[in-house]
Amino acid sequence: MRKEWVEKRKKDSVRTQMYYARQGIVTEEMEYVAKVEGLDPELIRKEVARGRMIIPANINHLHQKPMAIGIAAKCKINANIGSSALASDAAGEVEKVKVCQKYGADTIMDLSTGGDLDAIREEVIKHAEVPIGTVPIYQILHDCNNKIEDLTIDKMLEVIERQAQQGVSYFTIHAGFLLRFMPLVAKRKMGIVSRGGSLMAAWMMHYHKENPFYTAFDDILDICRKYDVSLSLGDSLRPGCLADASDDAQLEELKVLGELTLKAWDKDVQVMIEGPGHVPMNQIERNIKIERDYCHEAPFYVLGPLVTDIAAGYDHLASAIGAAMAGWYGASMLCYVTPKEHLGLPNAEDVREGIVAYKIAAHAADIARGRKGARDVDDAMSDARYKFDWNKQFELALDPDRAREYHDETLPQDVFKEAEFCSMCGPKFCSYKITQDILEKHGA
Amino acid sequence: MRKEWVEKRKKDSVRTQMYYARQGIVTEEMEYVAKVEGLDPELIRKEVARGRMIIPANINHLHQKPMAIGIAAKCKINANIGSSALASDAAGEVEKVKVCQKYGADTIMDLSTGGDLDAIREEVIKHAEVPIGTVPIYQILHDCNNKIEDLTIDKMLEVIERQAQQGVSYFTIHAGFLLRFMPLVAKRKMGIVSRGGSLMAAWMMHYHKENPFYTAFDDILDICRKYDVSLSLGDSLRPGCLADASDDAQLEELKVLGELTLKAWDKDVQVMIEGPGHVPMNQIERNIKIERDYCHEAPFYVLGPLVTDIAAGYDHLASAIGAAMAGWYGASMLCYVTPKEHLGLPNAEDVREGIVAYKIAAHAADIARGRKGARDVDDAMSDARYKFDWNKQFELALDPDRAREYHDETLPQDVFKEAEFCSMCGPKFCSYKITQDILEKHGA
């Protein structure tokens, strides 16, 4: 859908959404987003210009539907997919893309580490109508035959440009983790739990030189500026357990991410900031406020956070609690966690569970923030319940298949789809029926 | 375990924990609770005397292990079980009791409505080491052959005493829903969604007389006082959807529950207050504060709340978000919700899912409140993760079977239980390994 839009901008020296926004231009992408969000196009433009909202939309991902991440927009969710050394076919990843889009992921990160990474990414982008994000260090490492010490800045930039050229709309870059933070890491219970972060640590320790993503940040920005790839500034030092939450390692890195944000904005590159992780409920609001402060209100993109460390097997749920609260307090996008977190690799069913958990969290956050119209679908559901319209209830549920399946376990016959009761109270003592009698006598 | 304790009190005119507490006596139950909670026995006594904590322990449930519900104690969870017209054998309910206790329910409510209710309850109590709660109106209705208009106060009191005599430790009584609230119900989107509440409505509408539980409240208190049955004052008018949350119907009933609390305390009867239901995140704290105010700090026992209405099939999760927050803000017990909520009757697997979801919520709440030692198990889990001790990780997880099962899906062989990596990053780029290298170089 973006073919013509992008085509006519061909001669512009810079083509990022932020650049246009700052020129006072409302792009077609902004118009589209305004429509989807039910907001004024001029508000979208202002938010993008201010850096408080991003529209991740690589100029080469032409069939992508524009979407916005930022506090003025609805809370978004990301789902991670990706091949591994064990399961590395493109078809499998395309299947996952379909599951993600079916259940409503707003963006998808392709975290592939096994197989032909370029070919897989090409297929993923081809089948995605949502923005695709990546963590380029995974491919850089892959191209170095898993020898992190072979990483050079040239190799790094080559891979980043290759991915940008392919149509990736945002990159997680671990540029904020500096050599001087090593002693802070050593104080932690869990150290580094970010894979990209630990790779950076390994490289820095090997050469005792500064983080190459930090050193070459300007060159990375030039690539992002060229293709309008947004940056998702990675939190290499996100806490891996409650004990490490909101500690010096995390917050010192966050300050650097704030500095990098300003650098990116100088080049009209869109930025969001990645956040934790594992955080007890009473520290979530504080984390959101600190990010807003240190990072100049760039959109906050959090991973959960998990509100306890002992929920292995149910971490989608333990993290959805933190995610819902984070969204309410002001996070703009929630990265899902699946039930397999800390235990193994998610399959398609885990992806579904993770996405629905996060749709619940993001929607609950929109309601709690009082976003216009956020509760309309809930009200429609309540009306359907009250009217015993079961098919409508299934349709309005975040996972219609699951709702229908559970209902039909007890009452499978079609006639019960209009029955004025359900299996819980049975026909004689349905609360809704009794309420309707009250209404008749006492009026509405 | 309580046989001797109860035996020696035989001649006391009143034998409720609240009575003893007010006499300055620390009972064996209080001692036991103090040990379990890691609190001073005198604090327990004071809290029980003040009505801010209850120890639901019927004098006839002698093998029950004492436990406490109140803000000074750890956050508790309740699981509901119960027969229906379709599945009404006692053995099935005993199985559910075992599942509840295995996964850590702190109390169990037997909400049976089908089969021989007395016989089922007897079996449930026999197999339960946790307090059993009931909703007597279900049996009253059953004994009236499902004709609610046949309910009389005598019949009501007879059933209540029968259940008390059997050893039920707390009763949900819908005494706060008064005739004058009918017009408030008529204003709602969803009316009444509490089954007990709708039965009361049906009776009141039929006779146009005041709620019989309210009228006979003093007689009910006498029974509770005799057997030390705690009251769980039911919220007949809990909101059934976000649109009805915190409305006049809910709050007017809550005020009456506050009045009834004082009446109960006058007779040394222990009380907790039931709460919603469906509440958007931004109203949860307010709900907790209002209850504290209206109900004189009697422990608050909430059902979820669900933070969105559109999560059918995942309502255990949508409600665990609200429950965790409620626990953090000060609710003392969380009533679980299963994935079948709004759709059908839960099976054993649903019970497991519901309980674990609520264990997560209650534990996260304890951590967020900063309870002494609450995070110790999380720290132990983090240590086990860092040491690659997989068996220890499974053991510390809230659902060890599930954690092991998910891990073994990818790496089933025994050797991987000590492997210094997992299936997520593989052996070469384990973040923990890299952190350990940093530690060697930079010290702890």
From Swiss-Prot, chains A, B:
Enzyme Commission designation: 4.1.99.17
InterPro entries per record: ThiC (IPR037509), ThiC/Bza_core_dom (IPR038521), ThiC/BzaA/B (IPR002817)
Cellular component terms (Gene Ontology): cytosol
Catalytic reactions of this protein: 5-amino-1-(5-phospho-beta-D-ribosyl)imidazole + S-adenosyl-L-methionine = 4-amino-2-methyl-5-(phosphooxymethyl)pyrimidine + CO + 5'-deoxyadenosine + formate + L-methionine + 3 H(+)
Positions contributing to Zn(2+) binding: H278, H342
GO biological process, one term: thiamine biosynthetic process
Cofactor dependency: [4Fe-4S] cluster
One GO MF term attached to the UniProt entry: 4 iron, 4 sulfur cluster binding
Record-listed [4Fe-4S] cluster binding positions: C422, C425, C430
Keyword Iron-sulfur: yes
Pathway: Cofactor biosynthesis; thiamine diphosphate biosynthesis
Pfam family, one: ThiC_Rad_SAM
HAMAP family referenced in this protein's UniProt entry, alphabetically: ThiC
Entries under NCBIfam families matching the protein: PRK09284.1, PRK13352.1, thiC
Function per UniProt: Catalyzes the synthesis of the hydroxymethylpyrimidine phosphate (HMP-P) moiety of thiamine from aminoimidazole ribotide (AIR) in a radical S-adenosyl-L-methionine (SAM)-dependent reaction.
Matches recorded under PANTHER family: PHOSPHOMETHYLPYRIMIDINE SYNTHASE, CHLOROPLASTIC, THIAMINE BIOSYNTHESIS PROTEIN THIC
Family to which the UniProt record says this protein belongs: Belongs to the ThiC family.
Protein name from the UniProt record: Phosphomethylpyrimidine synthase
